[in-house]
């Protein structure tokens, strides 16, 4: 009986491997089911086009925003979501993690990581080719006739909330709030979404579920893709403060430390150090400029984007070789000097961007900051984040803790 938990864990991991193998085998076959489509004329049109989605051999630009939770990735995602010629997806890898990784393991084991990364790369490759049917393997319950209401944060994608993918009677073309999209649009038709994807020149995907750029090498080197990686980093002290505020239960011991002034003996330090280790490993690879990343990698500090959003956005689009859309410029103008009361939603993007980047300095005690600086000193120096040497320095907004650095893209 003492080994029963090991047996359960082994069975769970075996089940994951079997699921993933089955998905790989099944998805090698056609997803196309013309008879199941009910829209007038749509089945015939798709049947004439062929039974499968072909690989896109044009030079579509495929953008991946590589980030971690609470690093400003939703904000960066909007810089692409607002572009009229970009098909943007918000965290599609959520479905992979939710389906393949048992909740009780939280995806921390090496075996979980290998399964997750293999499945994630396969899904990303398919999504960049506008094959949204592949996503159905990870949606529970499975879509019926390629329609579902279970796509994670569907409302965060403008295209999925606009005509022709969404066509609610009597509604205007503009749906402002994510919740409005979900309520007014009804079921998501993945066939229509795939058509909308193919009509656009570029595909952008945001993820916080790939630890580092090395994990993407197979996709970067895939000749069928034109993948460019925007790695978004943020001061780990700021990430810790934001997560403690947003995920109050998960980070309750950090909050307890802040409230009592005493460090809990059972504090999960990996909630901080994992971020620093992943940043350091990934950024080290990027800054070494290996040949496989030439023209494919750009490092962006959230703080630089927050201080000068228009300038940094122009640099990002120049690196990608995509013309900057006027809708993007307008969105930046309207959403980076916003009323702070409008940015309280934990995934909101309306904010005073410069103030938001510095807010962590008033949400952490100096003891916690000193601990974080000691644990993450290498990556702080690597990314140009200065140490706060006293409580007074930490709380003084006139003293910048961000060095001037010019992280140029590897061209």
Curated annotation (Swiss-Prot):
Gene name in the database record: Chst1
One Gene Ontology cellular component: Golgi membrane
An annotated Gene Ontology molecular function: keratan sulfotransferase activity
Membrane topology (UniProt): Single-pass type II membrane protein
Species the sequence originates in: Rattus norvegicus (Rat)
Cytoplasmic topological segments: 1
Cross-referenced Gene3D superfamilies: P-loop containing nucleotide triphosphate hydrolases (3.40.50.300)
E.C. designation(s): 2.8.2.21
Pathway in which this enzyme or protein is active: Glycan metabolism
Keyword Transferase: yes
Principal location class: Golgi
Protein name: Carbohydrate sulfotransferase 1
Keywords, ordered alphabetically: Carbohydrate metabolism, Glycoprotein, Golgi apparatus, Inflammatory response, Membrane, Signal-anchor, Transferase, Transmembrane, Transmembrane helix
Location of the motif Cell attachment site: 337-339
